[in-house]
Curated annotation (Swiss-Prot):
Encoding gene per record: san
Residues annotated to bind substrate: Y31, M75
N6-acetyllysine: residues bearing it: K47
Span of domain N-acetyltransferase: 6-155
Predominant location category: cytoplasm
Organism in which the protein naturally occurs: Drosophila melanogaster (Fruit fly)
Gene Ontology MF: a single term: protein N-terminal-methionine acetyltransferase activity
GO cellular component: cytoplasm; cytosol; NatA complex; protein acetyltransferase complex
Keyword Cytoplasm carried by entry: yes
Protein name according to UniProt: Probable N-acetyltransferase san
Subunit structure: Component of an acetyltransferase complex, at least composed of san, Ard1 and Nat1.
Length: 184
């Protein structure tokens, strides 16, 4: 399989049922109607992954403005098991990284992973994520109920490291355009 056979598409009212079905198959938790309403409004932060015009995966994220930080939260990123290890997850993750890079104002990207999901943990570690916390009893109605919090810290640097004037400009549009974005 080549990456050219993998395409990402928008989540729309016409295909939201495919996302619901996919999530039911891929994830051990069920998502409520509000989740899907939010996904429909997420734009570039929610994508279906197609392989030969068949929905085989999806990624859904949201912006989290808590803990005095602006972070990107990966709510779901999953692929049907027959299509795993073919680069589909990587394409979805790279889409999210590109979004974060273009935005230029995220402190980190984070997500929760069930503590026994070694495949997912290794997938994210491959992209520089680290386990930063473990939440006991995070999940309801599934075992194990504990979840690791995985995080990738993002660092923004001004083009001229000898001057901080660029990063303190009052106009946020010029500020974000003036920064270079690097991943730690």
């Amino acid at each position: 399989m080549t990456r050219s056979s993998i395409e990402l598409g928008d989540v729309t009212p016409h295909n939201i049922k495919q996302l619901k079905k996919l999530n039911t198959v891929v994830f051990p938790v069920s998502y409520n109607d509000k989740f899907y309403v939010d996904v429909l409004e997420a734009g570039e932060l929610a994508k279906l992954a197609y392989y030969n015009d068949i929905v085989v995966g999806a990624v859904c994220c949201r912006i989290d403005n808590t803990e005095n930080q602006r972070r990107l939260y990966i709510m779901t990123l999953g692929c049907l098991s027959p299509y795993r290890r073919l680069g589909i997850g990587t394409v979805m993750f790279e889409h999210i990284m590109n979004f974060a890079e273009k935005d230029g104002n995220f402190d980190s990207i984070f997500l929760h992973v069930q503590i026994n999901n070694n495949g997912a943990i290794e997938f994210y570690k491959k992209f520089g994520f680290e386990i930063v916390d473990t939440k006991e009893q995070y999940y309801k109605r599934i075992e194990p109920a504990d979840a690791h919090v995985l995080q990738k810290t993002l660092r923004r640097t001004a083009p001229n490291s000898n001057s901080t004037a660029t990063s303190t400009t009052a106009n946020s549009n010029s500020r974000s355009k003036a920064r270079q974005f690097t991943f730690v």
